[in-house]
């Protein structure tokens, strides 16, 4: 039995959001929408994708999550899609911010009538749909269709025979963080790194040298940002910081490490600059670990300026 459902997302035209800002509106002519943006979605449907996920953006003023033309008329009637449609994370709730509905209850009604089958984490359906059906705002036929499409997929996955097939604590303990998986992840990460330059074979730093290395920056001891955004199950306690990795790698050698944070990730506070500069002057080599907070690289975290908030001027002609 196949036990994975493919999901096509985000439906639709999420890449056309104005100014590149997530959740924003997309103003598209019918020709552009149908001939440029829709073909990949149709190809996914024809390939047998089992689910579609609604996008956050508006299309010509209507959020995808509440767009009946998109989810029912086009996807189901014209294209013949038989699977189920799920919102993006709290996608129904988000429609209130688009000012197309006044409250969460109305958002749930709009989504249900548009053809949204599953509410991802928003809690709108579970809280309001019974009341909406009693008030005649959503038909029982709509509910039946949505439920049937979800249950059919669960049946095809074998969950009717064994609904707890993957809820195995012992299996998880023996699978997650296995040494061979960690090694594969390490090798994959190493292959993804781009070394922009290595003048005079600066790297790797020899273990035989009697030198002091200054590790400076907010990413030196940081562990949560090692996982990055959308890390799923990743736990900061399981990450190895730059400081931990280097001090372990060079333990028992003549290479000495000193450290200064220098700044933080979320403000332009310069109060730690002096300490960082003083630390750099005590070292033969300076390694600066800079970057942006992981929350800034996720969805709805658009920035108008890609510069780092705090830059420490620690380089000198005598410091590589």
Residue ranges of each PLM-predicted region?
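Glycoside hydrolase catalytic-domain context in secreted enzymes
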Residues: 1-315, 319
């Amino acid at each position: 039995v196949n036990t994975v459902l493919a999901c096509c997302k985000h439906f639709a035209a999420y890449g056309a959001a104005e100014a590149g800002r997530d959740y924003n509106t997309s103003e598209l002519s019918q020709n552009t929408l149908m001939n440029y943006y829709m073909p990949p979605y149709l190809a996914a449907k024809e390939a047998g994708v089992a689910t579609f996920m609604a996008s956050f953006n508006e299309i010509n003023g209507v959020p995808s999550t509440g767009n009946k033309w998109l989810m029912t008329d086009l996807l189901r009637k014209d294209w013949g899609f038989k699977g189920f449609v799920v919102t993006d994370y709290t996608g129904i709730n988000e429609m209130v911010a688009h000012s197309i509905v006044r409250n969460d209850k109305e958002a749930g009604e709009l989504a249900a009538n548009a053809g949204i089958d599953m509410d991802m984490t928003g809690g709108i359906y579970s809280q309001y749909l019974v009341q909406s059906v009693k008030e005649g705002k959503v038909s029982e036929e709509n509910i039946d269709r949505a439920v049937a499409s979800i249950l059919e997929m669960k049946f095809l996955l074998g969950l009717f025979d064994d609904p707890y097939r993957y809820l195995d604590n012992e299996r998880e303990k023996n699978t997650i963080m296995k040494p061979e998986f960690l090694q594969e992840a390490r090798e994959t990460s190493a292959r993804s790194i781009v070394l922009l330059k290595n003048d005079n074979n600066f790297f790797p730093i020899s273990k035989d040298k009697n030198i002091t290395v200054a590790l400076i920056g907010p990413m030196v001891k940081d562990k949560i940002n090692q996982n990055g955004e959308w890390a799923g199950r990743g736990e900061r306690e399981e990450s190895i910081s730059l400081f931990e990795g280097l001090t372990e790698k060079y333990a028992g050698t003549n290479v000495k490490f000193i450290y200064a944070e220098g700044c933080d990730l979320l403000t332009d506070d310069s109060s730690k600059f002096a300490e960082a500069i003083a630390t750099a002057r005590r070292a033969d080599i300076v390694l600066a670990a800079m970057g942006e907070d992981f929350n800034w690289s996720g969805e709805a975290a658009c920035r108008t300026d890609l510069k780092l908030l705090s830059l420490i001027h620690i380089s000198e002609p005598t410091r590589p």
